[in-house]
Amino acid sequence: MTKNGDIVEKRAYPSPNPAIRLTEITYMSQGLRIKGLLAEPKTEGTYDGFLYLRGGMQSIGMVRPSRIAQFAAQGFIVFAPYYRGNRGGEGKDEFAGADRYDAVFAVDVLKQFCNDNIHVFGFSRGGIMALWTAILRRDITSVVTWAGVSDATATYWERTDMRRMMKRVIGGTPNRVPEAYDARTPLFEVEHITAPVLIIHGYQDENVDIEHARQLAFFLDDANKTYETWYDLHYAHQYPPAKNRETVRALCEWMKQH
């Protein structure tokens, strides 16, 4: 009998970095077989765990091997779940509905490879997944949300290009089913977060408005939680390559200090 977080299949995956080993893993989440990508430094050692929670929906924003290898090269064992219904995984992606448990149980996958420190990172839609993971677990060391979504209702109104998909997945508009949007919004549950949170966001972001970051900071502050903000006046959703690399290094250092 398999349980949540059990690994049921592994296969070697081509790596863009000769110093990093990639493995595609199939694991169990609520009775579904979910897939994800594991990145491990080949140099022997004990490493912290890094849960990489991707942005996007279905094929948009899919996990990029080069990106998770980049984080692994900073000295982490990285696991990036694809979420249910993606790349051969069972079930349906629900935009932070029951699929939040694919992130929650991915921590149990990661623990089979790393030491006791588990850092959770979410980019864009991954931000909402990262916050839910930190709300639903007590064993998270730190959380970083970069250009992260924190409010499902705001995303619906901001992203006209995502409305059809969100209506289909969530079951209607925020006006028709406000409770379904509230149930996906982690802001109302941040008092359960036990890990420090780093919020990274660019003021010029047109995909995820800076207000997602400011609201998250407000709610964390109100709940007396430990958090830090790295806002940038000039950058949008995707930082330029040099700034991106610099931010990756800086956030990884921040994680290691917690």
Model-derived segments and spans:
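Mobile cap/lid helix-loop segments that gate and shape the active-site cleft of serine hydrolases
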Residues: 153-189, 195
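Alpha/beta-hydrolase fold nucleophile elbow
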Residues: 114-124
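Short beta-strand/loop motif that positions the catalytic acidic residue
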Residues: 193, 199-201, 205
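Short glycine-enriched nucleophile-adjacent loop
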Residues: 127-138
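Short substrate-entry loop that stabilizes the transition state in hydrolases
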Residues: 45-47, 52-91, 153
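Alpha/beta-hydrolase active-site loop
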Residues: 94-113
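N-terminal cap/lid segment of alpha/beta-hydrolase-fold proteins
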Residues: 2-43
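C-terminal catalytic histidine-bearing segment of alpha/beta-hydrolase fold enzymes
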Residues: 214, 223-258
